Amino acid sequence: MLKRPSRTTVFTATATALSLLGDQALYALLPLYFQEIGLLPIQVGILLSANRWVRLLTNHLAEKLVEKFPVNLMLILSLTLGALLSLAYAYFSSFLVLLVARCLWGLCWSFIRHISVMGVASSTESQNLGQMMGFYNGISHIGNILGIILGGILFDLIGFSTTLALFGIISLLAVPFAIKSGLQTSNNITNQQQNYKSTKRYTALLFCGFCIGSVGPGLIMSTLGFILLSRYGTEVNLIGFVVGIATLNGLLLGCRWVLDTLGAPFCGAVIDRIGIHLGAQICFIVGLIVMLLLNLSESLAGLTLGMIIFFICGIALYSAFSAEASRLGAQVFARYASACDLGAAFGPVIGWGAYELVGTPNFVFILGAGLYAIGMFSAFSAFRQHE
């Protein structure tokens, strides 16, 4: 049975959601708009992954500074700077300026995510952590929904710059939620982390985090708009209405976050009950099969159904492994988050680089299936023992 989320969970998740608007809009819009501002395809991949590369360092910086400085202050500063960076996306077209802005966003996100997730973990009983992490992910990903879907719609109506500037202003509303969250963190969530790091389960946790990050947030998020454009052109007929490809891309990517908001708590509760070994195997296998089928299917209906199934698998995997990592303390979570970010950083570069080499965006799905196979074997070998 689902339990009611705490005030800390709800308020930090809401602040996180508001902070994500500009970042997520950029993932939906830049693959469609990069030629107008003079960027090359490989530069798109670099910009959409730069924030993740930076987090390989800043995740550990966040973990260290949380022990020394007030977490509320660090969260407020990160949310404020993150909102202002959306204005840089809106009004600058220089690759160098955009690259600096994306790196700074990576710094902000390291603090926002680490402080929020560890705050949820420190206020939750261990046996319910998957469910509470599902609530946090579900609520926070409302920001992804609005950033992607509303961003796509507003892009077709008012343009790239105005959309991102508007999202930057709205993101400042995250600050009051952070102030009222009653946030606390604990350095004593568990005493298991030093022993855990010596086991193959720890290695598998990092491998799985890499695979989850590289496929969903990396490959799919950064290339789906271009896949749609190459398959269907600039407009499609959707249930009797002609819509722009940016709107369609926003709707499809937004489905992921709608499903996350509605289903993440349930997925987390199920995996709390059946265990990470069985749950991870099911999700990796189904996701792998779906991506192979997406490579073969050209129909819009088939692509839509396949993406929905893939998103559900990704939601369950993210909730399960995030809960497993946060259960083991700040240091383990920081390293797991870095593994996810490493995968998410490689994803756009691999996807766009493969397109330049192979010449077909559909190859992204084959790459995704291969990475999920690695995750599947890692989880199978390391999480077989009784949990």
Language-model segment annotations:
Residues 163-179, 364-380:
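Symmetry-related core transmembrane helices of the 12-TM Major Facilitator Superfamily/SLC fold
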Residues 29-42, 222-246:
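Short amphipathic helix-loop junctions that connect adjacent transmembrane helices
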Residues 57-89, 271-274:
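Conserved MFS/SLC helix-loop-helix module at the cytosolic interface between two early adjacent transmembrane helices
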Residues 111-124, 316-329:
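Intracellular juxtamembrane helix-capping segments at the cytosolic ends
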Residues 73-87, 168, 278-292:
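Structural signature of the two symmetry-related core transmembrane helices
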Residues 277-321:
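C-terminal transmembrane helical hairpin of 12-TM major facilitator-type secondary transporters
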Residues 5-32, 201-220, 308:
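Pair of pore-lining "gating" transmembrane helices in MFS-fold secondary transporters
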Residues 52-60, 144-145, 257-265, 344-345:
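Residue-level signature of mid-helix packing/kink "hotspots" within the transmembrane helices
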